[in-house]
């Protein structure tokens, strides 16, 4: 590993890529949104239903993911205006992370694992 993981100096820049990544994808609902997009779900309402995210929160998460270029918004209907969302290459690069989180959750966070 080329960079050390540890506490940061409050006066200096952070040098932890994990913390940097969590600044982007660590908010509630964000990883579930990325999961849905990885599954091929692309429309706002479907993402909202499948994740349970509140409408306003989902809008904020989608905007942030677009700002960080993890997703791209595409217009699929002009009247009324309707958009869909797709993963960019950077978003697709997170799929192994999502897979690992799912596997970890199955082993350690599922109700049977806690019993």
Stretches with model-predicted labels:
Residues 1-13:
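N-terminal intrinsically disordered/low-complexity leader segments
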Residues 12-57, 78, 86:
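N-terminal helix-turn-helix DNA-binding core of bacterial DNA-binding proteins
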Residues 26, 77-100:
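Basic, amphipathic "hinge/linker" alpha-helix immediately C-terminal to the N-terminal HTH DNA-binding motif
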Residues 29, 69-70:
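Glycine-centered, phosphate/nucleic-acid-interacting loop/turn motifs that mediate DNA/RNA or nucleotide
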Residues 61:
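Residues within the DNA-recognition helix of helix-turn-helix
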Residues 93-115:
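Amphipathic alpha-helical dimerization/coiled-coil segments
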